[in-house]
Swiss-Prot record:
Pathway: Antibiotic biosynthesis; daunorubicin biosynthesis; Antibiotic biosynthesis; carminomycin biosynthesis; Antibiotic biosynthesis; rhodomycin biosynthesis; Antibiotic biosynthesis; aclacinomycin biosynthesis. Pfam families: SnoaL (PF07366). Its EC number is 5.5.1.23. This is Aklanonic acid methyl ester cyclase DnrD. Keywords: Antibiotic biosynthesis, Isomerase.
Length: 145
């Protein structure tokens, strides 16, 4: 494996273990995943990534994990094909926990800058996950803070 793919594998390991004390070693100070802005719009860098790991475990249980399917690279970019497995145990954009298990494939595009992960976009299988959760409705309060 390449050094760039090794960095992405460390990211996946953090999601799987929940361990974030070393993320500054592989997450850039300017790290941004636009999909996480909904949860913490002001956070960037290793702190933003650590918050995303914490949220994943909160919403989908400590048993949530990403299975590595395939990695590809193109210049500074790494494409990771992963599958997420978990159980819905916490509030998910206004939808209370259902306790249901789910799985779904995802694509992650990650750019390495200065030897660290700086840019990160992911496209999970939202529709498939929503159906597996039983198509729950949000609470009356919804997802607005």
């Amino acid at each position: 494996m390449s050094t760039q793919i090794d960095l992405v594998r460390r990211m996946v390991e953090a999601y799987n273990t929940g361990k974030t004390d070393d993320v500054a070693e592989f997450i850039h100070l300017e790290y941004l995943n636009p999909g996480a802005l909904e949860h913490n719009p002001e956070l960037r860098g290793p702190e933003a990534f650590a918050a995303a790991v914490t949220w994943l475990k909160y919403a989908f249980s400590e048993e949530a994990h990403l299975e590595e399917i395939e990695y590809e690279e193109n210049g500074p970019w790494v494409r990771a094909k992963l599958a997420l497995y978990g159980r819905h145990v916490g509030n998910l954009v206004g939808m209370p926990a259902t306790g249901r298990r789910f799985s779904g494939e995802q694509i992650h595009l990650i750019r390495i800058v200065d030897g660290k992960i700086r840019d990160h976009r992911d496209w999970p299988d939202y529709l498939g996950t929503y159906r597996q959760l039983g198509e729950p409705w949000p609470t009356p309060e919804g997802w607005r803070p």
